[in-house]
């Protein structure tokens, strides 16, 4: 085997190959260049040149005719041309037929070497036969030999064999054999495909030489031949004789055509075959390019294979490296050895002053180690050094390369060299440090370990200088700190992730291999106290954003906060975190939110139970206010902002998260002597939360998860800022319409000042034009631009209540208020509530605060009574009421949690052993009861507002239901009737206010159905039932609790329940309504038997009209209701029988009406029955009740007869 390899290496050394110059001339058919070739070079190309000269060309141009003459002149003096001409004179058609017959014969004989049709029995050896034969026979000899080899190749199933052939081995006849081979392939391409011929030539001696000549005479076939050889090649070429021969042949081809060498290398990678060839071609290219300072092609190529995204290529090349190391022989002929040697030479070529660990020992005696021994890495070599380090990391970590002692020594020297303070230098130091962690086996001797410690100490000393000089925020100092923290907290897996991330590759690092490095870091270089003290002094990253990659101070601080190092060693970190939050920009860095969360945890949770006071300090209120300077009020809101919107949003996230965590940890904090305090309500009032949330909404892509986190905190702590109507209104304000309005924005709209607006309001209602013009212009401004006008708008709302103010002004003010509500709701609400207080002479108005309104939301409804009949301002009032009701719930829940910590101590003093949970339950129940009372009171007040005042009744406003009012307008036919009714129509102020109130009540009932139940158990004026049932869509939920309401012992509640049910049955004629109505009829029948005379009159007089509604909604109840009515009449008649006999005819009529309703239909239409002709005021209550029964029956009959 070894002899065969030696033969392969030396077989072609004495032969002359086609030069790159000659091949290029053949490719381009450059006759001038061909004429300049020497005779030996020209001899190799004769087959192609002779064919060009003799065969009829496809190109009939004059230029080719001249070139052809030059070729003929060139060939005229060459003796070998005659023999090639003779070869071309043979009958190739007959030759091809004989070859085909021989192929068929061999196929039948199973590939055996039987009688040949092409060549008769040979008298002598193949070489002598070739020498004595004429041209036709020479063609047959070579063709027969070639076909035999090709057949054997096809039958070998990929197993390589070496075929000994005199014809291809005799140095005397190589050129003649090559001529014959080229002519055969050119004239018989279908019989001898060039790729198959190339494959066959690999199996004979001098095959690479023959292959190069063949391709040189058919230069267009170069890529086809190379691709075919690579495709049929081995996955690992250095493992077999065939692979090495194939690699050598392709290498010779690429030397002949160097311009295509890299393309051939690309084919190698694409097919994942012949890795040695890819490396060999790269080595050849590297030697030719002579690149000293830049990264060599070899480094780029191998790095691309191992660090690329193609896992198949990575595995294929890694196998090549591993297999190469497993072979015991590692001679200079090995491609892997050549590659390693070349890489080592490149590494040594960029090293600073050559030094070793021995020099360190000598230097320690007489000089400082950083004077001359540790000379720096040249700036032009830094990038190349980084690339080499990454390549060696990939070779060792991915491909499993085991470095030799020399390689390890030189690598350690390079890693511990000192680069200049440039961004590339920072990158190089980070890579070197991570490589030391990943491959600690490179440090094997005490001297090398000392060298590493000295270098790490230099890193710590020079870190600040590097950061200031290079201008790179992500310096290696942060990485040192981070690794030290990970070692102290024994987070070895985190170190491994950090190393892999920095190196940019996933390599296997055993945690046990880091044990020595851990000892060095934690005991010699970075103690935990040193790490903590140093971290605070690290400058914050300026304009920190996600665009700044790498390991930053924020990563170190985050890990130290997680491990509670700051509190453990009593180091204040609050100022650093505050400064870093101020120095932020978009896109948001992903480490900022986790940093805030862990910082809040360190404020509220002690580091250890033994030291409960070991916590960090929270950010002060003044520092928070400084962040929002320019956003808190002021006319120039856009000009005064010192800090970015990112910083403001992060501080808002900190405050909301802090308050939430404070409430969640009240029981834990109760044990602390120095308890963290909640931020004051005055501070929260000054922060424009809604404005900031709106800003965040437009920056969702750049803020990552911050916007969604803020929405979650807002929904939990400030539900009144998350009202659905507000979001819908916001969509309208920020949508397409807003863009169109901005296009209409004129300079006049921008020039109106708040002072001008105040002067215009002062002229109302005498002069409405000016204020109308200004506020119409203001509608074109954005929400943030309207903020300076908020105080003027709200303070003048009370003037708008005076008579004579146009509705358009009111509606425009309402529109502006809603726009302002999207950016400053809390401040706006407080100003509006104070502005709408009733003006009482000689009584000083109280100025309410945000806290007052959250404690008692009903203050909102203690406004000027004129607001109740001003729909645009009532809409604003209802909006505020809804918000403050929600805010009150959140406030009380937070207050309950805040004061929870005081309860256990009180329980202990009382001595309620084993009942410590009872007070909490009671407090929760009391809170819920308070909230329910608050909500129900608000509903009752709103319902009372829906009732017409005495003045409105005097003016003829109809207090009837919304449903009946709508029907009356629809059915009115007289054109002048609407004029007579005045404002009693769908557009009157009372009707509009009723609609607004019904909408709010609907929302409240849907949000909490218990409110509806509580309100209806309390009851309200029955005149409002038509309005509430028709105007509140969610009133159908009352059907669930009406049976319970009817079962109440109070007669008033029973009456209210039946009246409510009668309206619900008309509005919702559902099976459920029918069952409840049937229950009500049965209850009425039961009560008839138990009620006294007075209570009977009080109960049935208001409820009997409800029976008509039951029948109208559900005709099947007709029989039961008629029986009930007659039963009531009989009971009443029996009570008055002894006093008067007038009642008997009524009972008789009732019986007749029930039995023959059709006969009484005309009588029922008589006005005396409908209106009642008798004086009921002086009648007995039972008599009055009987007459009421009669009217009810007649109404039911009229309804049934008319088909209604």
Curated annotation (Swiss-Prot):
Gene: INTS2
Primary subcellular site in the record, as a coarse category: nucleus
GO CC annotations on file: cytoplasm; INTAC complex; integrator complex; membrane; nuclear membrane; nucleoplasm; nucleus
Subunit-structure text: Component of the Integrator complex, composed of core subunits INTS1, INTS2, INTS3, INTS4, INTS5, INTS6, INTS7, INTS8, INTS9/RC74, INTS10, INTS11/CPSF3L, INTS12, INTS13, INTS14 and INTS15. The core complex associates with protein phosphatase 2A subunits PPP2CA and PPP2R1A, to form the Integrator-PP2A (INTAC) complex.
Name of the protein in question: Integrator complex subunit 2
Domain of life: Eukaryota
Family: Belongs to the Integrator subunit 2 family.
Keywords: Cytoplasm, Membrane, Nucleus, Transmembrane, Transmembrane helix
Record PANTHER family: INTEGRATOR COMPLEX SUBUNIT 2
TM ranges: 428-444
Subcellular location as annotated: Nucleus; Nucleus membrane; Cytoplasm
Annotated function: Component of the integrator complex, a multiprotein complex that terminates RNA polymerase II (Pol II) transcription in the promoter-proximal region of genes.
Membrane topology of this protein: Single-pass membrane protein
GO process terms (BP): regulation of transcription elongation by RNA polymerase II; RNA polymerase II transcription initiation surveillance; snRNA 3'-end processing; snRNA processing
């Amino acid at each position: 085997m070894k002899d065969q390899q030696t033969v392969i290496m030396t077989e072609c050394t004495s032969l002359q190959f086609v030069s790159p110059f000659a091949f290029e001339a053949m490719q381009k058919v450059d006759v001038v260049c061909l004429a300049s070739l020497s005779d030996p070079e020209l001899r190799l190309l004769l087959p192609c040149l002779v064919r060009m000269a003799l065969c009829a060309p496809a190109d009939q141009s004059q230029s080719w005719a001249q070139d052809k003459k030059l070729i003929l002149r060139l060939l005229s003096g060459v003796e070998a041309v005659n023999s090639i001409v003779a070869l071309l004179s043979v009958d190739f058609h007959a030759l091809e037929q004989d070859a085909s017959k021989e192929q068929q014969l061999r196929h039948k004989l199973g590939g055996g070497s039987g009688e040949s049709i092409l060549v008769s029995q040979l008298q002598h050896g193949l070489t002598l036969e070739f020498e004595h034969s004429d041209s036709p026979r020479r063609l047959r000899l070579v063709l027969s030999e070639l076909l035999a080899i090709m057949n054997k190749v096809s039958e070998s199933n990929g197993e390589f064999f070496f075929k000994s052939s005199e014809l291809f081995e005799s140095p005397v006849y190589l050129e003649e054999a090559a001529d014959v081979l080229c002519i055969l392939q050119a004239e018989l391409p279908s019989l001898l495909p060039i790729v198959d011929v190339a494959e066959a030539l690999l199996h004979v001696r001098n095959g690479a030489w023959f292959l190069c000549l063949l391709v040189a005479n058919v230069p267009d076939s170069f890529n086809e031949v190379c691709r075919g050889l690579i495709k049929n090649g081995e996955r690992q070429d250095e493992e077999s004789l065939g692979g090495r021969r194939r690699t050598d042949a392709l290498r010779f081809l690429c030397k002949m055509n160097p311009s295509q060498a890299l393309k051939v290398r690309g084919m190698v990678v694409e097919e994942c075959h012949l890795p040695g060839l890819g490396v060999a071609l790269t080595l050849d290219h590297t030697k030719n390019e002579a690149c000293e300072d830049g990264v060599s092609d070899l480094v780029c190529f191998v790095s691309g294979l191992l660090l690329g995204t193609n896992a198949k290529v990575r595995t294929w090349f890694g196998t090549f490296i591993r297999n190469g190391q497993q072979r015991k022989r590692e001679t200079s002929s090995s491609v892997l050895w050549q590659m390693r040697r070349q890489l080592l030479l490149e590494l040594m070529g960029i090293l600073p002053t050559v030094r070793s660990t021995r020099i360190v020992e000598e230097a320690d005696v007489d000089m400082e180690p950083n004077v001359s021994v540790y000379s720096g890495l040249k700036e032009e070599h830094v990038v190349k050094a980084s690339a080499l380090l990454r390549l060696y990391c990939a070779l060792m970590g991915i491909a499993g390369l085991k470095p030799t002692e020399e390689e390890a020594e030189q690598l350690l020297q390079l890693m511990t060299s000192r680069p200049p303070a440039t961004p590339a230098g920072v990158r190089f130091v980070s890579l070197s440090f991570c490589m030391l962690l990943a491959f600690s086996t490179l440090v094997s001797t005490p001297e090398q370990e000392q060298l590493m410690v000295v270098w790490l100490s230099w890193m710590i000393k020079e870190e600040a200088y590097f950061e200031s000089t290079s201008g790179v925020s992500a310096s290696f100092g942060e990485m040192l700190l981070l690794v030290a923290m990970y070692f102290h907290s024994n987070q070895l897996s985190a170190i491994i992730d950090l190393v892999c991330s920095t190196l940019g590759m996933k390599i296997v690092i055993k945690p046990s291999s880091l044990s020595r490095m851990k000892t060095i870091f934690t005991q010699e270089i970075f103690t935990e106290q040193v790490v903590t003290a140093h971290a605070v002094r690290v400058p914050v990253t300026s304009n920190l954003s996600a665009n700044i990659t790498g390991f930053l101070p924020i990563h170190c601080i985050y890990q130290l906060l997680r491990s509670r190092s700051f509190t453990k060693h009593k180091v204040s970190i609050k100022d650093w975190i505050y400064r870093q939050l101020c120095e932020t920009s978009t896109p948001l860095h992903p480490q900022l939110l986790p940093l805030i969360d862990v910082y809040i945890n360190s404020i509220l949770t002690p580091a250890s139970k033994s030291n409960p006071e070991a916590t960090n300090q929270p950010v002060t209120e003044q520092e928070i206010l400084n962040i929002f300077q320019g956003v808190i009020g002021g006319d120039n809101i856009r000009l005064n902002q010192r800090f970015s919107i990112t910083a403001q949003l992060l501080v808002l996230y900190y405050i909301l998260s802090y308050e939430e965590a404070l409430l969640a940890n009240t029981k834990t904090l109760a044990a602390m002597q120095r308890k963290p305090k909640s931020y004051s309500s005055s501070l929260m009032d000054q922060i424009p939360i809604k404005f900031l949330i709106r800003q965040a909404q437009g920056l969702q892509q750049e803020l990552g998860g911050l916007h969604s986190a803020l929405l979650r905190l807002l929904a939990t702590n400030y539900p009144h800022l998350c009202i659905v109507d507000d979001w819908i209104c916001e969509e309208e304000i920020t949508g397409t319409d807003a863009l169109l309005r901005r296009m209409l924005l004129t300079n006049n709209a921008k020039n109106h000042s708040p002072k001008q607006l105040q002067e215009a309001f002062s002229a109302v209602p005498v002069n409405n034009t000016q204020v109308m013009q200004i506020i119409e212009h203001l509608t074109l401004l954005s929400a943030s631009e309207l903020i300076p006008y908020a105080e003027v708008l709200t303070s003048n709302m009370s003037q708008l209540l005076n008579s004579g103010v146009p509705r358009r002004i009111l509606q425009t003010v309402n529109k502006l208020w809603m726009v302002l509500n999207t950016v400053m709701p809390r401040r706006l609400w407080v100003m509006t509530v104070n502005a709408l207080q009733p003006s009482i002479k000689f009584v000083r108005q109280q100025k309410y605060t945000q806290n007052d309104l959250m404690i008692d939301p009903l203050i909102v409804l203690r406004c000027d009574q004129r607001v109740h009949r001003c729909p645009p301002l009532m809409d604003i009032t209802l909006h505020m009421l809804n918000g403050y009701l929600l805010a009150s719930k959140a406030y009380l829940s937070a207050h309950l949690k805040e004061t929870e910590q005081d309860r256990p101590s009180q329980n202990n003093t009382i001595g309620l052993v084993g009942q410590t949970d009872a007070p909490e339950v009671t407090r929760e129940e009391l809170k819920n009861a308070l909230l329910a009372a608050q909500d129900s009171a608000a509903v009752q007040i709103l319902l009372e507002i829906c009732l017409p005042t005495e003045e409105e009744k005097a003016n003829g406003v109809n207090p009837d239901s919304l449903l009946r009012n709508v029907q009356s307008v629809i059915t009115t036919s007289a054109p002048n009737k609407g004029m007579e009714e005045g404002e009693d129509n769908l557009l009157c102020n009372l009707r509009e206010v009723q609609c607004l109130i019904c909408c709010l009540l609907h929302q409240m009932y849907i949000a909490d159905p218990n409110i509806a139940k509580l309100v209806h158990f309390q009851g309200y004026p029955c005149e409002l039932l038509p309005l509430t049932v028709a105007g509140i869509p969610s009133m159908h939920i009352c059907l669930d609790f009406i049976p319970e309401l009817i079962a109440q012992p109070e007669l008033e509640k029973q009456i209210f329940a039946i009246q409510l049910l009668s309206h619900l049955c008309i509005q919702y004629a559902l099976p459920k309504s029918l069952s409840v109505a049937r229950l009500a009829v049965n209850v009425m029948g039961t009560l008839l038997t138990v009620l006294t005379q007075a209570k009977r009159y009080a109960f049935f007089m208001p409820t009997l009209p409800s029976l008509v509604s039951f029948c109208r909604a559900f005709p099947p109840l007709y029989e039961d209701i008629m029986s009930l009515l007659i039963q009531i009449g009989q009971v009443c008649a029996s009570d008055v029988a002894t006093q008067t006999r007038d009642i008997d005819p009524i009972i008789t009529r009732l019986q007749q009406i029930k039995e023959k309703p059709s006969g009484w239909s005309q009588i029922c239409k008589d006005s005396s029955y409908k209106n009642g002709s008798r004086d009921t005021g002086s009648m007995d209550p039972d008599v009055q009740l009987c007459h009421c029964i009669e009217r009810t029956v007649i109404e039911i009959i009229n309804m049934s007869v008319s088909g209604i």
